[in-house]
Amino acid sequence: MQGYRNYSRLQLELTENRLLVIGPNGIGKSNLLEAIELLGSLRSHRASSDQDLIHWEEQRALLRAIADDTEKLELELRRQGGRQARRNGKTLTRQLDLIGPLRCVGFSALDLNLVRGEPALRRQWLDRVVQQLEPIYSDLISRFNKLLRQRSQLWRQWRHIPIQERDSLLDAFDVQMALVSTRIHRRRSRALARLEPLAARWQETLSKHKERLRLDYQPGSQLEGEEAEEPWRLAIETQLLGQRSEEERLGSCRIGPHRDEVRLLLNDSEARRFGSAGQQRTVVLALKLAELELVGELCGEPPLLLLDDVLAELDPGRQLLLLEAVGEKHQCLVSATHLEGFQDEWQQQSQIIEAGSLNRSEEVR
């Protein structure tokens, strides 16, 4: 790793199944886990721009990893804009082709807002899950966001567009947005249907059979019946047409995946509104364990689990359940401020890295 966040240069060999990165807050533990997640998924949940990821003295950041002893992955971020991805020394024309060998599931203290936070947080979580299962999904999200921006720009320029051209412009947008929206809705719906029984089982276990969890997908378009693409596409086109007057008044699109909501129901009550803080944290834990299980099941191998300062936010009982659930199956990288809370067995079987040494040494084993 070169020129990434607060790291000028770092070479780290992660040999054990359990890895503990220990050190005070603000020293760069989260940056290390973020770099691994970025290389595995091409996304950072902590930064909106690559500019935020590049060391302030550098013009580029370079991430490299060897996964499964065979796959060499590289991602270069440039301050002037643009990325370059390489796999086994070959420059990739599509960044998405980097995804696969280093699948990760991240769980940080920020994820604890998943239940009580805004709908956008649940959409982003669901999108990360779908992308792990179908890397091409990122293209759909990018296409939809671009169409949404262009449509908003169209409304801002509406008065300057000749009247005879307006309907044809909107018709063209409706066709494209309906198609992309349908494909996003279908993938989100399928992913939630797969996640729900797993999350429900984990919630039942974590609550000692006291709580029943349901995941209720509420698409931002009015959709009925089976997930067939053509009926859903036509339904969305019809809704976009019917909403034009309202859309013109508001200057924004009211139909589509950007309006989706995922309701999390505990014993048929909305966890966001009626769940206690402890119940909400249990729901997040159940969702993350379900995600970990689903990605491993559908992708054929257990993903790397990144636990970023999250154990300190869980009570001892939930900490123990999480660490037991991870077991020996997953390689797990955990950041924490201290070793308290980790069982002696976990510490003895873990590679322990002092975070304070990372910036002073080029190579840590």
From Swiss-Prot:
Lineage: Bacteria, Bacillati, Cyanobacteriota, Cyanophyceae, Synechococcales
Primary localization: cytoplasm
InterPro entries: DNA-binding_RecF (IPR001238), DNA-binding_RecF_CS (IPR018078), P-loop_NTPase (IPR027417), RecF/RecN/SMC_N (IPR003395), RecF_2 (IPR042174)
NCBIfam families, alphabetized: recf (TIGR00611)
Key word DNA-binding present: yes
Protein name per Swiss-Prot or TrEMBL: DNA replication and repair protein RecF
Presence of keyword Cell inner membrane: no
Single annotated GO MF: ATP binding
Function of the protein: The RecF protein is involved in DNA metabolism; it is required for DNA replication and normal SOS inducibility. RecF binds preferentially to single-stranded, linear DNA. It also seems to bind ATP.
Gene that this sequence comes from: recF
Similarity comment: Belongs to the RecF family.
GO biological process terms, semicolon-separated: DNA replication; DNA synthesis involved in DNA repair; double-strand break repair; SOS response
Organism: Prochlorococcus marinus (strain MIT 9313)
Record PANTHER family: DNA REPLICATION AND REPAIR PROTEIN RECF (PTHR32182:SF0)
Sorted UniProt keywords: ATP-binding, Cytoplasm, DNA damage, DNA repair, DNA replication, DNA-binding, Nucleotide-binding, SOS response
Subcellular location: Cytoplasm
Pfam families xrefs: SMC_N
Entry GO terms, CC: cytoplasm
Residues at which ATP binds: 23-30
Classification via HAMAP family: RecF
SUPFAM superfamilies to which the protein is assigned, alphabetical: P-loop containing nucleoside triphosphate hydrolases
